[in-house]
């Protein structure tokens, strides 16, 4: 019996050895001794023991690598946390973030409120129609201004501004469209312009007289006003005035009659030139003297020279009537005007340019507190309702005086103020 058991044990040992080799175990001397010790236990228990032992060995070998991987992973997480903390530190404070968020919300809402493409196309079409309508009007400054404004609005709409801006543009376009609609038709404007041209040509052929010049000036002003394209009510008013002017011009004498009147006036003027006149043209006659009120300004000494060049002298006042007449002329024009009075020769001693002294009765004409000789004021002037002393080197107007010419009685009657001025043409 013992002999038969030994071959079986050897066979079982060989089988166990092959199974263990299939599981990946290498046969060692210790292993053989251990197998020998366990040879008397069940085969399943031996296999389970060896399996647990192998698993423990594998886990023990993996512990160091798992620890290193966990450490590297923690380091990576720490670095990410550090970077995130730094990034959060750079963010603005909470109020700033809320403000940005609100602005984003508003922008999103504004973009959502933009008009649809069809609405934008409608605005663009109205712009094109307005542009075409303005292009048909005559080339006037007001229309060019409208056209430029339309072009600017067209460019602005093309840039799609925010809703409030688009509404403003749309309202302005509506007003412009209404304004263009109120303009007269092209044919009506041409008719007005043609009538203006005809009236201008007709008036241009009339003799140069005050009434006709007034009509001509009014026509020119009306033409300029029509060129600026005022509002409809103003255009109707201008058109009515043009109609009235046209009727008035039609009532004027014929061209041949006007030429006859003009020739007679020319002959009359030539005859008057040959007659004796008390004072030259642009001079004023008063009590046997002629007075010239300048339209330019000079200092006191140059004013004396200017009067001498026309055979006169800087005015010397001889009577209260003459003083009142000259003071009235100066105050009416609201001018500071030199007279021929100074104290240049001796301070405080006033005398006229003809060498005569200032009479005591004339001292009443000085303004209150004058003469005061502030800053070497040595020359007298008409100032307001009286006299004033001022610096002689200042530029002021001046009055020249000379005796009037003597004429016969018939010439004096003929040259009365009523006959000396040519009659205007009949109105």
UniProtKB/Swiss-Prot annotation:
<dbReference type="GO" id="GO:0045087">
    <property type="term" value="P:innate immune response"/>
</dbReference>
<keyword id="KW-0735">Signal-anchor</keyword>
<feature type="repeat" description="3">
    <location>
        <begin position="142"/>
        <end position="164"/>
    </location>
</feature>
<keyword id="KW-0399">Innate immunity</keyword>
<feature type="disulfide bond">
    <location>
        <begin position="307"/>
        <end position="400"/>
    </location>
</feature>
<feature type="short sequence motif" description="Endocytosis signal">
    <location>
        <begin position="31"/>
        <end position="34"/>
    </location>
</feature>
<feature type="repeat" description="6">
    <location>
        <begin position="211"/>
        <end position="233"/>
    </location>
</feature>
<feature type="binding site">
    <location>
        <position position="370"/>
    </location>
    <ligand>
        <name>Ca(2+)</name>
    </ligand>
</feature>
<feature type="short sequence motif" description="Endocytosis signal">
    <location>
        <begin position="16"/>
        <end position="18"/>
    </location>
</feature>
<dbReference type="InterPro" id="IPR050111">
    <property type="entry name" value="C-type_lectin/snaclec_domain"/>
</dbReference>
<feature type="topological domain" description="Extracellular">
    <location>
        <begin position="59"/>
        <end position="427"/>
    </location>
</feature>
<comment type="subunit">
    <text>Homotetramer. Interacts with C1QBP; the interaction is indicative for a C1q:C1QBP:CD209 signaling complex. Interacts with ICAM2 and ICAM3 by binding to mannose-like carbohydrates. Interacts (via C-type lectin domain) with CEACAM1 (via Lewis X moieties); this interaction is regulated by the glycosylation pattern of CEACAM1 on cell types and regulates contact between dendritic cells and neutrophils.</text>
</comment>
<keyword id="KW-1015">Disulfide bond</keyword>
<keyword id="KW-0465">Mannose-binding</keyword>
<dbReference type="Pfam" id="PF00059">
    <property type="entry name" value="Lectin_C"/>
</dbReference>
<keyword id="KW-0677">Repeat</keyword>
<keyword id="KW-1064">Adaptive immunity</keyword>
<dbReference type="GO" id="GO:0009897">
    <property type="term" value="C:external side of plasma membrane"/>
</dbReference>
<feature type="domain" description="C-type lectin">
    <location>
        <begin position="286"/>
        <end position="401"/>
    </location>
</feature>
<feature type="topological domain" description="Cytoplasmic">
    <location>
        <begin position="1"/>
        <end position="37"/>
    </location>
</feature>
<feature type="glycosylation site" description="N-linked (GlcNAc...) asparagine">
    <location>
        <position position="80"/>
    </location>
</feature>
<comment type="function">
    <text>On DCs it is a high affinity receptor for ICAM2 and ICAM3 by binding to mannose-like carbohydrates. May act as a DC rolling receptor that mediates transendothelial migration of DC presursors from blood to tissues by binding endothelial ICAM2. Seems to regulate DC-induced T-cell proliferation by binding to ICAM3 on T-cells in the immunological synapse formed between DC and T-cells.</text>
</comment>
<feature type="repeat" description="7">
    <location>
        <begin position="234"/>
        <end position="256"/>
    </location>
</feature>
<keyword id="KW-0130">Cell adhesion</keyword>
<dbReference type="InterPro" id="IPR018378">
    <property type="entry name" value="C-type_lectin_CS"/>
</dbReference>
<dbReference type="GO" id="GO:0002250">
    <property type="term" value="P:adaptive immune response"/>
</dbReference>
<feature type="binding site">
    <location>
        <position position="389"/>
    </location>
    <ligand>
        <name>Ca(2+)</name>
    </ligand>
</feature>
<dbReference type="InterPro" id="IPR033989">
    <property type="entry name" value="CD209-like_CTLD"/>
</dbReference>
<dbReference type="GO" id="GO:0005537">
    <property type="term" value="F:D-mannose binding"/>
</dbReference>
<dbReference type="GO" id="GO:0038187">
    <property type="term" value="F:pattern recognition receptor activity"/>
</dbReference>
<dbReference type="InterPro" id="IPR016186">
    <property type="entry name" value="C-type_lectin-like/link_sf"/>
</dbReference>
<feature type="disulfide bond">
    <location>
        <begin position="379"/>
        <end position="392"/>
    </location>
</feature>
<keyword id="KW-0472">Membrane</keyword>
<keyword id="KW-0254">Endocytosis</keyword>
<feature type="repeat" description="8">
    <location>
        <begin position="257"/>
        <end position="280"/>
    </location>
</feature>
<keyword id="KW-0479">Metal-binding</keyword>
<feature type="disulfide bond">
    <location>
        <begin position="279"/>
        <end position="290"/>
    </location>
</feature>
<keyword id="KW-0430">Lectin</keyword>
<feature type="repeat" description="4">
    <location>
        <begin position="165"/>
        <end position="187"/>
    </location>
</feature>
<keyword id="KW-0106">Calcium</keyword>
<dbReference type="GO" id="GO:0006897">
    <property type="term" value="P:endocytosis"/>
</dbReference>
<feature type="region of interest" description="8 X approximate tandem repeats">
    <location>
        <begin position="96"/>
        <end position="280"/>
    </location>
</feature>
């Amino acid at each position: 019996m013992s002999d038969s058991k030994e071959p079986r044990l050897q066979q079982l040992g060989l089988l166990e050895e092959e199974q263990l080799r299939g599981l990946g175990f290498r046969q060692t001397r210790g292993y053989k001794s251990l197998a020998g010790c366990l040879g008397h236990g069940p085969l399943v228990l031996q296999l389970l023991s060896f399996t647990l032992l192998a698993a423990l060995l594998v886990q023990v070998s993996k512990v160091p690598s798992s620890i290193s991987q966990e450490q590297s992973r923690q380091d990576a997480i720490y670095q990410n946390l550090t970077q995130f903390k730094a990034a959060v530190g750079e963010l603005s404070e909470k109020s700033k973030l809320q403000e940005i968020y609100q602005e984003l919300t508003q922008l999103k809402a504004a973009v959502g409120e933009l008009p649809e493409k069809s609405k934008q196309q409608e605005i663009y079409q109205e712009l094109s129609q307005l542009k075409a309508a303005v292009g048909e009007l005559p080339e006037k400054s007001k229309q060019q201004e409208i056209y430029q404004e339309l072009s600017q609005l067209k460019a602005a709409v093309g840039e799609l501004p925010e809703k409030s801006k688009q509404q403003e543009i749309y309202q302005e376009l509506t007003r412009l469209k209404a304004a263009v609609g109120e303009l007269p038709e092209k044919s009506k404007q041409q008719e007005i312009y043609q009538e203006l041209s005809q009236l201008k040509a007709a008036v241009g052929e009339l003799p140069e007289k005050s009434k006709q010049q007034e009509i001509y000036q009014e026509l020119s002003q009306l033409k300029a006003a029509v060129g600026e394209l005022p509002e409809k009510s103003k255009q109707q008013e201008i058109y009515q005035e043009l109609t009235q002017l046209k009727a008035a011009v039609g009532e004027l004498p014929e061209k041949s009659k006007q030429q006859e009147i003009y020739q007679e006036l020319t002959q009359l003027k030539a005859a008057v030139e040959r007659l004796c006149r008390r004072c030259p043209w642009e001079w004023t006659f008063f009590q046997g003297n002629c007075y010239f009120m300048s339209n330019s300004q000079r200092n006191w000494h140059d004013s004396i020279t200017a009067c001498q060049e026309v055979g006169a002298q800087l005015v010397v006042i001889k009577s209260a009537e003459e003083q009142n007449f000259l003071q009235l002329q100066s105050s009416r024009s609201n001018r500071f005007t030199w007279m021929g009075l100074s104290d240049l020769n001796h301070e405080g001693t006033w005398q006229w340019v003809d060498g005569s002294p200032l009479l005591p009765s004339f001292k009443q004409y000085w303004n209150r507190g004058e003469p005061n000789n502030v800053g070497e004021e040595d020359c007298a002037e008409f100032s307001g309702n009286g006299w004033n002393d001022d610096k002689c080197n200042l530029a002021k107007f001046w009055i020249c005086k000379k005796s009037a010419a003597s004429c016969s009685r018939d010439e004096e009657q003929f040259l009365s103020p009523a006959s000396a001025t040519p009659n205007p043409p009949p109105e």
